[in-house]
UniProtKB/Swiss-Prot annotation:
Gene: hslO
General function of this protein: Redox regulated molecular chaperone. Protects both thermally unfolding and oxidatively damaged proteins from irreversible aggregation. Plays an important role in the bacterial defense system toward oxidative stress.
PTM info: Under oxidizing conditions two disulfide bonds are formed involving the reactive cysteines. Under reducing conditions zinc is bound to the reactive cysteines and the protein is inactive.
Protein name per the record: 33 kDa chaperonin
Similarity section: Belongs to the HSP33 family.
Length: 288
């Protein structure tokens, strides 16, 4: 059994007789595919990894079909960082910079004055949006406050990013009191203390079963079947073309003339190029 079998997987687990539940996720290929088409500074890569892990853990709490968007907006050199994830663990991320960012910049140095916005969007029903002030040193601490405020449940988040065997990796754990409140108040504190001892080489380089045994070998832990985590952008020629149709014919003709008769629409998330000439644009109009 090798650790790779649990790369890009999310596990849920339950502590028997403790009324506490947990989640563990590790993103390897899904994280590297997010970074492949961009040249983000290390500090931005790490922040996106943290946000991807947080989004994966958040979407795992959904009890309906839908998606969650975790977004940071600020007035610093990092203008925007955005991650979107679905209940089926399809995830995508992007960042927009408006200044120089060094590899050792802190969250607040990158963001300046900013907010963290979490949008929960079920396929059916109303959206819910929560706004979190970025007044703590790390995104993890800000998100813990969000959980306790929005769900009023004690929550612990562990999020780590870095490299393992020369490849980028992001991983994390969530520990949360069950809503029924049937356990002892000390149960969560006991398990949180154990969880906090996890090392990078364990969360990056062990299978979920091995890591959970190391942390909680005296506990009864029920582990559920994993979900695969995948990078999925969702862009298409149709979506890119729809954006062009919002532009007037006169302006389109001008753009086509400036670009030798072909407009290059590049997806900001995955970097895919979609090319449209006048014939392709006319066909899109006929399909409206």
């Amino acid at each position: 059994m090798t650790y790779q079998q649990d790369n890009d997987k999310l596990y849920r687990y339950l502590f028997q007789n403790r009324a506490v539940r947990g989640e563990w996720v590790r993103m390897n290929k899904s994280f590297s595919e997010t970074l492949n088409t961009h040249h983000y500074p290390i500090a931005v890569q790490n922040l996106l990894g943290e946000m991807m892990v947080a989004t994966g853990l958040l979407t795992a709490t959904l009890k309906f079909t839908g998606h969650i968007t975790v977004q940071i907006q600020g007035d610093g050199p990092l203008k925007l960082a955005l991650v979107n994830g679905t209940d089926s663990q399809q995830i995508r991320a992007l960042a927009r910079l408006q200044g120089e960012i060094s590899d050792d910049m802190t969250l607040h140095q990158m963001i300046g004055k900013g907010v963290l916005v979490i949008t929960i969007a079920p396929e059916e029903g109303e959206r819910y949006q929560g706004v979190v002030t970025l007044d703590k040193p790390t995104i993890t601490e800000c998100l813990e406050e969000y959980f306790e405020r929005s769900e009023q449940l004690k929550t612990q988040l562990i999020i780590r990013t870095g490299e393992f065997n020369g490849e980028p990796v992001a991983a994390g754990m969530l520990l949360q009191v069950m809503p029924d409140g049937s356990g002892s108040p000390d149960d969560f504190e006991h398990l949180a203390a154990l969880t906090a001892t996890v090392k990078d080489d364990e969360i990056f380089g062990l299978t979920a079963e091995e890591m959970l045994y190391r942390l909680y070998h005296e506990e009864q832990v029920e582990i559920y079947a994993p979900q695969a985590v995948t990078f999925h952008c969702g862009c298409s020629a149709e979506r890119s073309g729809a954006a062009l149709l919002l532009i007037s014919d006169a302006e389109l003709d001008e753009i086509l003339a400036e670009h030798n008769g072909s407009i290059d629409m590049q997806c900001e998330c995955c970097g895919t190029h979609y090319f449209f000439n006048r014939d392709a644009i006319d066909k899109l109009k006929m399909q409206q």
